[in-house]
Regions:
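GHKL-family ATPase ATP-binding module
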Residues: 1-228
Length: 228
């Protein structure tokens, strides 16, 4: 019994994304260096997750490995470089993160290595350091050539990164605000009558038992410096 996909990994990606809204076409590339051959393809869809798969000598590496590290690192570098060149990222702006750049990406990286090394018995993670270098080299050369000739596709990819970065920054601000509020709030049950001053060296807190005592203390306190 033979399993055959006429379009190779391009067809594989099309099949994975067949029920999704495409943002780009499937982009494929290939190359070879130092006896290691690299074949890759990717497509962006209108989703907020990434799906990047790695294979070495037709073995699926469920935990990824150095070939995926090379791809991800180089791809992020390329997109940030173009984003600055196109003035989409200003001088004051931080670079997109790797997850930003891969937002909505489905990708497959397949290499052929003459002497593959894996972590563990199950071959779920590739461990060859030269694989990262070769994949990065091929990705850098081939995708730079592609994006130079396909500006609209490049802008669509950068648009996905911008959207992810905006969401990430919004979530970070919300988390920071929540932590800041928790830092300055000691009231866990709604019964703290806080003082107005934020200078801890001048403030004091009184702990009283019962609502009656609490009410009297609140009336008599100095609101500027005394909390009940």
């Amino acid at each position: 019994l033979d399993y055959h996909e006429p379009e190779g990994i391009v067809g594989f990606i099309k099949d994975m994304n067949k029920s999704c809204e495409a943002v780009t076409d499937v982009i494929s590339f290939q190359g070879e260096s130092d006896g290691i051959s690299v074949e890759g393809a990717f497509q962006y869809i209108n989703e907020f997750h990434e799906n990047v798969l790695g294979f070495c000598n037709n073995i699926y590496n469920a935990e990824g490995g150095t070939h995926l590290t090379g791809f991800k690192t180089q791809f992020t570098t390329i997109i940030n470089s173009y984003a600055r060149e196109l003035n989409i990222l200003k001088e004051k702006d931080q670079n997109f993160t790797g997850p930003d750049v891969r937002n909505g990406m489905t990708a497959v990286i397949s290499i052929k290595h003459p002497d593959p090394r894996f972590e563990g018995q199950t071959k779920t993670k590739l461990d060859n350091q030269d694989a990262a270098k070769v994949v990065a080299k091929v990705v850098g050369e081939e995708l730079t050539r592609f994006f130079d000739r396909n500006l609209e596709t490049l802008k669509a990819v950068i648009g996905c990164a911008e959207k992810a970065a905006k969401i990430r920054k919004t979530e970070e601000r919300a988390k920071t605000n929540m932590l800041t509020k928790q830092k300055f709030s000691f009231d866990s049950n709604g019964k703290l009558a806080n003082c107005e001053s934020k200078d801890a060296s001048k403030c004091e807190i009184f702990i009283v038992e019962g609502d009656s005592a609490g009410g009297s203390a609140k009336t008599a306190r100095n609101r500027q410096y005394q909390a009940i």
